[in-house]
Amino acid sequence: MGQYPTCIHSVISNNPKDLNQFLEKLGSRLEEIELELVVATRVQVCLDEMLSNAIKYGYPPEKTGQIEVSITYETDEIVVSVTDDGVPFDPFTRDDLDSLDLDIEDREIGGLGIHIVKNMASRVDHQRQTNRNINRFWIPLS
């Protein structure tokens, strides 16, 4: 295991193009610091889901917003925080999917991304403070 920086911090707009650029840069950064592949993959998949949700559902089409991403390395886990100025929404309150055993045509639309985050992370948290959604998830380093 390499020596990790204390924090990676970035701000993107609610534009899908910015999301793709951010994820590419993040992948390179996680490679540079030699984060284990399984951990880096979990961070990237969860961030892709959380940021995609914020961009797709958090803003009316005409509103430009800012989404902050903070990745903090602790002793045995990584804490990822996604903070946006979009509409109030707690993605983690949705019930777990009961329809995973059904054929794709019979499943309810939505919720699979958050289901993935909940299963890859050791814990998740949402807060609403000063007109901002603060969503956090924890990824174990081992």
How does the language model describe each region?
Residues M1-V11, K118-S142:
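Flexible, glycine-/charge-rich segments associated with ATP-binding catalytic modules
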Residues Y4-L37:
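Helix-loop-beta hinge of the Bergerat
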Residues L26-D48, D106-E108:
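Conserved short strand/loop->alpha-helix "switch" segment adjacent to the catalytic nucleotide/phosphoryl-transfer site
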Residues S81-I109:
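Glycine-rich/acidic phosphate-handling loop/turn and adjacent ATP-lid/helix
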